[in-house]
A protein has these predicted regions:
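Bacterial N-terminal signal peptides that target proteins for export
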Residues: 1-10
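C-terminal motif of bacterial Sec signal peptides marking the signal peptidase cleavage site
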Residues: 20-21
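Soluble ligand-binding/transfer domains with enclosed cavities or grooves
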Residues: 27-305
Length: 307
């Protein structure tokens, strides 16, 4: 199967996986949001002012979950993301979920983004088990913090065998909760400017130039890189063990995703709630964050102060 077919197949799979897995939409996180933006550019939410007037306290952040994010509109998800900092670059295994916010039209145009600019492709829905491909890149990630590298956790190699080849079993394998998982689609980790909110950095997950990483395989790893989907992710920490991410394909925003590590959450959340402080690996910008006590509930807010 040629590369163009696989790129389009992945795009179709992403849309199909979400549509087949639809469930009742939950309510959005019960936290403060700015009013909905108007149609004019001048009516858009000022993210710096929003954070100054309605900072998210640790208590607010504890109310956000991977599930209730799916009940928020894209504008609400953006407002949450803009009030977060990068936090520490993660380390270890994280479970991932991609999601399309309430009222979003991303499902309909995702395959269009993936297929844009690819000439001569033939849409072949029977080319692979599309439902398995849909969440490959955002299903789960393994962070090698000290190396500045990330690899994606694949739990079913069957759909990839036609392009990986007969030596598929040589791909590095690890055990996750008693299940076999394979590591593919490497990416480089670093701090960089957010494409949504340039006031501070995010943790960047970059698939563009990864052919020099140990274990790189031209197929299928090239599909996520500069000659394929040109995927670039960015993440910020909601609270310990929980990150909110934005995925871009071909420089166009494509979808949101969440990453969660239960062990880290259980271990570090109590101290976070009590102190409101975290370690920051990335630049937090001129609108710096500090821990301050809330008079009402003695909660500590990650408040912003303009220098």
């Amino acid at each position: 199967m040629n590369r163009s077919r696989w790129l389009m197949s992945i795009g179709l799979a992403l849309s199909q996986a979400v549509l087949l897995g639809c469930s009742p939409t939950p309510d959005p996180p019960p936290i403060p949001f700015a009013k909905k933006s108007g149609e004019q550019y001048s009516d858009k939410v000022d993210l710096a002012r929003l954070e100054h007037e309605s900072p998210l306290t640790p208590a607010d952040l504890m109310k956000i979950t991977p599930d209730n994010l799916k009940g928020a509109t894209q504008e609400q998800v953006d407002q949450i993301y803009a009030r977060l900092t990068a936090g520490p670059i993660p380390g270890g295994v994280y479970d991932g979920q991609m999601f399309f916010p309430k009222g979003s039209s991303e499902r309909a145009r995702l395959a269009e983004i993936v297929g844009g600019g690819i000439k001569g492709f033939v849409v072949d829905r029977k080319a692979a088990k599309l439902e398995h491909i849909g969440e490959f890149i955002w299903k789960g990630k393994v962070f090698y913090r000290s190396e500045g590298v990330l690899r994606n956790r694949i739990e079913d190699l069957h759909a990839l065998k036609p392009i990986v080849g007969p030596d598929v079993e040589r791909i590095k394998k690890l055990d996750v909760d008693g299940k076999d998982a394979w590591l593919l689609f490497p990416a480089k980790l670093y701090c960089g400017q957010s494409l949504l909110d340039g006031r501070r950095e995010s943790v960047i997950i970059d698939y563009a130039f990864t052919d020099d990483l140990p274990g790189y395989r031209e197929m299928p790893d090239v599909l996520a890189g500069r000659e394929g989907l040109e995927i670039r992710d960015e993440i910020r920490m909601v609270r310990p063990g929980f990150y909110l991410g934005r995925a871009y394909m071909k420089k166009v925003f494509a979808l949101n995703f969440s990453l969660y590590n239960q062990e880290v959450a259980d271990k570090e959340s109590p101290s976070f709630v009590g102190s409101g402080t975290i370690n920051e690996d990335c630049w937090v910008g001129n609108q710096r964050t500090t821990a301050m006590a809330s008079k009402a509930g003695n909660q500590h807010a990650r408040l912003t102060e303009t220098r």
